Amino acid sequence: MTLHFDFDEGSQGFVAGFADYPPAHEEIYELTSGHRALPPPLESQSGLFISGVNRSDDLFMFFKGSIDGLTPGASYGVEVSVEIATSTPAGCFGVGGAPGESVWIKAGVTAEEPVAVMEDSYLRMNIDIGSQSSSGTQAVVLGNVANSRPCEQSREWELKALESESTPAGITVADDGRVWLLMGADSGFESRTEVYFTRAAVTLTPSPAG
């Protein structure tokens, strides 16, 4: 079973969230999100926009949406893919890491709703998304936000398709028949990142345990 999400048509029920930052100082992170038209030359399309300024060595910016109507107790293997729009060129240097190659796009499907919870003075994800370039058991690295343009050229927004990957862990559907698709940007670049999520796809393959 493969499900496709086209965010040109609207938010599809997806909502934004942020983690790996201290909420007491949220204003300096300049966290922004919403469904909006893409910048030129892609202005004929729309997508889910998310942006923030990484000031803490790490910042996770994400969207989540529910997938309903599954059989409770069924088990599945998970493959995910996304398409993004990015204006970040390749091969640049930046504080903490490259603005393109050190911002990793991750996605996964979970039975538990992914939320940011307080841990000491920071908000952390309640699921295992891994850390920066490393996948977690519940979210896999699909690529980064660097586009095809070299750093020496002027910035231009481009679409970038990130190929499907399997998450390390499968899922078992909860009693409510609902699972959650998570897609986000895990930043090691200590400045502003802006990215649009334009499409996503999820393939659920019944596993022997189901």
Predicted regions and their residues:
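Extracellular carbohydrate-recognition regions
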Residues: 1-28
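Short beta-strands within extracellular/lumenal beta-sheet-rich domains
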Residues: 55-71, 160-168, 197
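A short beta-strand element within beta-rich, extracytoplasmic domains
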Residues: 74-91, 183-185
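Extended, low-complexity, turn-rich repeat/linker tracts enriched in Gly/Pro/Ser/Thr and Asp/Glu
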Residues: 84-101, 113, 189-192
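Beta-strand-rich interaction/scaffold domains
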Residues: 104-151
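Short beta-strand-plus-loop segments that form exposed binding edges in beta-rich domains
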Residues: 143-167, 181-192
